[in-house]
């Protein structure tokens, strides 16, 4: 007698996994989730933009802060909703599916390897093409504490949840490691193009390394920490 297929397979979704990847959604949902996250951030920022009336000039500091927070919120809410299977799973289950997990001390060696690989790539890239340039968005957020909140804390956490936890995690259920890491990194880099095209290749490599780090350590937390470190250095250099 044939066994009845799990409900997840009947619904076209990957069955829950004991090991990596932890995602219970597939590649299509992962890509769609990024689009939904961007749309959510845009919709959440509309009131601030309308009230600020940017037709009179650049957005005010308050409006810029709200837009940045709205973007981060979109990158957090949509992955969380997808990970809960639209409310079926608990908060803890959703976080674990997104890679928000503890990690072993051995993860430190992979973090150091990731930093080393990125520094080598950045050095070679700068030697060949010159130092990448990005728009200085920090000043548009006002005081230093607010800059730290948005650039060093909110951005790394929300982007790792969205691009590594949701996107890479979902792609990994259907694609080989390198391919999934590359696709997620390309999306991550492309979405930063508005702040400076020359910085896109290093950001793509950074996203690629962080995806591999996630799989090696089984947690997005090491990637969040390195992302925070990277943004801290960038903020100090501006």
Which residue stretches match the model-derived regions?
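N-terminal, membrane-interfacial amphipathic/helix-forming hydrophobic leader that caps
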Residues: 1-102, 119-123, 234-238
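N-terminal hydrophobic or amphipathic segments with adjacent small-residue motifs
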Residues: 13, 20, 26-27, 35, ...
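Helix-boundary and loop/linker segments of multi-pass membrane transporters
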Residues: 18-23, 57, 97-103, 135-143, ...
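Alpha-helical transmembrane spans of integral membrane proteins, capturing the lipid-embedded, hydrophobic core
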Residues: 30-38, 42, 69-76, 107, ...
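A broad, low-specificity signal for short, low-complexity segments enriched in glycine/proline
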Residues: 58-59, 112-116, 130-132
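Cytoplasmic juxtamembrane regions at transmembrane-helix boundaries
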Residues: 90-105, 175-187
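Transmembrane helix-loop-helix hairpins at the membrane interface
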Residues: 119-238
